[in-house]
Amino acid sequence: MIITIGGLPGTGTTTTSKLLSEKYGLNHVCAGFIFRDMAKEMNMTLQEFSSYAETNTEVDNEIDRRQVEAAQSGDLILEGRLAGWILKKSNIKPDLSIWLKADPMVRCIRISERENENVDLALEKMISREASEKKRYKEIYNIEIDDLSIYDIVIESSKWDANGVFNIIEKAIENLKA
């Protein structure tokens, strides 16, 4: 089974992916972790690396390559803002494609708690990062990140806790056509 989970920072994609991975024994591949690792390898902050990635398409190409390679082996949770799009462009059909969304201030608070940062600083970074990524996705892939038409399920994650979001997805998996 291949499941893609996408969402902007702070929507709960990583938490949800981990819960699903544990429940179904699926490998968890996260584009964000790949991106963060690459930033660390180059001794850059996420903001610096996002700016670098805007003009260096090899960053996205490497992340994409790793995601497609993982998906070709099957049985995984593929987490990333473009995970669903990358598989679609590679003609790999996931069993379930999910997008999590949440109110921007809810996301900002979650990020500030996760990163142990002041809310105002977290908001500034979040806005900058998302603008950078939106521009990059449009230029490199001709993808509008706000286009949710490829997803089977879109969940407003600020309405439920992590277990509530997990339960919704679990029911969807149980009811997938064989």
Swiss-Prot record:
ATP binds at G7, L8, P9, G10, T11, G12, T13, T14, T15. It is an enzyme of class 2 (transferase). Its main location: cytoplasm. GO terms for cellular component: cytoplasm. Its EC number is 2.7.4.25. It is found in: Cytoplasm. SUPFAM superfamilies: P-loop containing nucleoside triphosphate hydrolases. This is Cytidylate kinase. Transmembrane segments: none annotated.
